[in-house]
Amino acid sequence: MSIAKGKNALLVASSYYGPFYPDGKNTGVHFSELLIPYNVFKKAGFNVQFVSENGSYKFDDHSIEESKLGDFERKVFNDKNDDFWTNLNNMKKASDIVGKDYQLLFVAGGHAAMFDLPKATNLQAVAREVFTNGGVLSAVCHGPVLLANVKNPQSVEGKTVVYHKHVTAFNKAGEEKMGVMDELKKRGMKSLNEIFAEAGATFIDPPNPNVNFTQIDGKIVTGVNPQSAKSTAEAAVSAL
């Protein structure tokens, strides 16, 4: 029997799709950071519902380049009959979601997350409800930016759900290695190291921005990059 049979998971995507990269390509939600966790949760027995702030999504241009797809990702990307697409095309907007119906929330990344998730008040409300009801909040790469903006309803001081938690995410060293830190700065955006420091979290840098690296602190589970998508999703299942 599947370990999560009868349980429900929310898989969160950014709704933003637009200019970001120095080469003129657009950012959106990262393809493999949606697909890989979806596969983990389905195998574990979860009912999976995709959601974004306004019910729309588009993939980050670089994340669907042929050279960026592994064998599994390429197979699913080219097979539009795969149930991944059926479920993805049933994406809901956050205002239509009842958070208490879900035991786990996972946020995919892509730099797009930095554009809309800090202001995605409906997604933040859903995440808060999942957390209040004892659910797991998990995210990978740039997805953790949502968690840094979710207030803990049990905190009278209005602290975030990541306050005094050990977290990780795509860090400043990674942005610099990609050559996009200046792209963030000129849009008035900070690195995730800075964002989590302001949210009262303890940010744990990976030994290298490109390695598989995950942090688990109670019901808060975070990962660094696409390489960490599988391990972060698996850790979220275990945390539940």
UniProtKB/Swiss-Prot annotation:
GO cellular component entries: cytoplasm; cytosol; nucleus
Primary site of residence: cytoplasm
Biological process (GO), any one: methylglyoxal catabolic process to D-lactate via S-lactoyl-glutathione
GO MF assignments: glyoxalase III activity
Pfam families per record: DJ-1_PfpI
Family designation: Belongs to the peptidase C56 family. HSP31-like subfamily.
Keyword rRNA processing among UniProt keywords: no
Name this polypeptide is given: Glutathione-independent glyoxalase hsp3102
Keywords, sorted A to Z: Cytoplasm, Lyase, Nucleus, Stress response
Enzyme Commission no: 4.2.1.130
Location of this chain's protein in the cell: Cytoplasm; Nucleus
Function: Catalyzes the conversion of methylglyoxal (MG) to D-lactate in a single glutathione (GSH)-independent step. May play a role in detoxifying endogenously produced glyoxals. Involved in protection against reactive oxygen species (ROS).
Keyword Lyase included in the entry's annotation: yes
Catalytic activity, as annotated: methylglyoxal + H2O = (R)-lactate + H(+)
Active site: C141, H142, E175
